[in-house]
Amino acid sequence: MIPIRSSITRILPNGFLSKPFLRQLNKKSKPNPHKNKNFDSFNEVFIHKTLLSSIKQHNDTDYVRCSIFNANGDMIQHGKEILKSQFIKRYNLTPRDFRKFNWQRSATGTTTTSSSSSSSAGQTSSGTSKSSSSSSSSSSPHSTISALSLSNSSLGSSTNVDIVPNITIRRNSILVQLLNIRALINHDQLIIFDNSSSFQNSHVSSYTHSQCLKDLSQRLKSTNLDGLPFEFKALEGILIYIVSNLNMEMKVHNTVLQNIITGLEDSIDRNKLRYLLIESKKIHQFHRKITLIKNCLEDLLENDDELNDLYITEKFNSEGDGQPRQGTNHEEIEMLLENYYQTIDEIVQIVENLKNQIKTTEDLINVVLDSNRNQLMLLGLKFSTGLLSMGVALYVSALYGMNLENFIEEIDGGFEVVTVVSTIALIALLLFSVKQLKKVEKVTMTSLNDQRK
């Protein structure tokens, strides 16, 4: 509390502050060195743990997590983490080959770093008894920053989806990136990279990844494809998985769209139109995705050199000759790719039909809404016509009811004459207006041509 004397004498007559008031302000603003010391120590620990977390995040990105199948279709390694430099050296790759593969650090490392930094910050802040309140207030921004980094990492991993497919051929391997499949195919190994690192979709992505690994293992163990090289078996297994997923997604979109269109046939409301808009966006995204996959296979089929380079086993067996495979004798891989290219092309055609259905539905909805709008406008014009006719009758009656002398009052039957005249004028104007409205309502192409002439 400021004393009464200082509160009274704080402002002098000349407009300056008094000395007692200045001393009071200096006393209030005097810093507490013990409190600042504790706060600085907490900031140092917080910055130190943040730097450690960033260093750990950088180190986690140097590892590649993958599952490896051998030539017999058996999974010899599952979820193994390998240094990226060792992986590149082992399979004769280049660092630019991994630009398409956006590696994310694991969720376990993130939670461990956050928990360790928060626990150490709590221990440091509880070291002194006088800084308990400051430690609680300081730990809240720490937890907020951890939560923000956690949400940003999960958001980045969930939205980090490469929509551009790619099949890259190297000297002794094939790099495949189609949908959520990122794989490396060798002459005797199939390597599937694990890129599921989202907290929100961890269960769904892990289940999908396990199903993919199971399907690929069964496909590689199939005895019906013993005549094909291993790289063709692996590539066909990946294409089968991709096509089945595309076909399933296409059926889901088709079912949802047909239900929406059926509902719009009964009634048109705001919610159904919103569902139609959302489904239209999803179908457009799906169409763009499968079109890119189709173009990827088409470009591969049109290049004979790349088709020859797909024979990894043959190049490995004849590596001592030093002669690359040439010519157009690549019927096996060409027939394999053409089969799935045609299947994907059929899916593209079906999706284009769905887009045409959406376009037709939108046009019909616009026509119906325009027709309803025209009906409302005509109804408003009819009411306006009736009010106009009634206004003429009211005008005549108003003239007759004025408090002025006129000859009609002296004539017998003047009231009847005014009533009949106003009624006739009302009916005549109403009939004329209705006739003009009918002409406006019955607009045809021939009438438009007549008006132009």
UniProtKB/Swiss-Prot annotation:
GO cellular component terms, alphabetically, are:
mitochondrial inner membrane
Answer whether the UniProt record assigns the keyword Mitochondrion to this protein: yes
UniProt transit peptide range: 1-19
TM segments?
376-396, 414-434
- In terms of domain of life, where is this protein from? Eukaryota
Q: Name one GO biological process term.
A: mitochondrial magnesium ion transmembrane transport
Q: Tell me, what's a Pfam family for it?
A: MRS2-like
Keyword annotations of the record? Ion transport, Magnesium, Membrane, Mitochondrion, Mitochondrion inner membrane, Transit peptide, Transmembrane, Transmembrane helix, Transport
Quote the InterPro entries the UniProt record gives: MRS2-like
Residues annotated as region Disordered? Answer: 108-141
Location of the protein in the cell: Mitochondrion inner membrane
Q: Which GO terms describe its molecular function?
A: magnesium ion transmembrane transporter activity
Q: Gene3D superfamilies this protein is in?
A: 2.40.128.330, Magnesium transport protein CorA, transmembrane region
Where does this chain carry the motif YGMN?
Answer: 400-403
Task: Tell me how this protein sits in the membrane.
Answer: Multi-pass membrane protein
Family, as annotated: Belongs to the CorA metal ion transporter (MIT) (TC 1.A.35) family.
Q: What does this protein do?
A: Mitochondrial inner membrane magnesium transporter required for mitochondrial magnesium homeostasis. Modulates the conductance of the MRS2 channel. Involved in the splicing of mRNA group II introns in mitochondria by affecting mitochondrial magnesium concentrations, which are critical for group II intron splicing.
**Official protein name in the record:** Mitochondrial inner membrane magnesium transporter LPE10
Species assigned in the record: Candida albicans (strain SC5314 / ATCC MYA-2876) (Yeast)
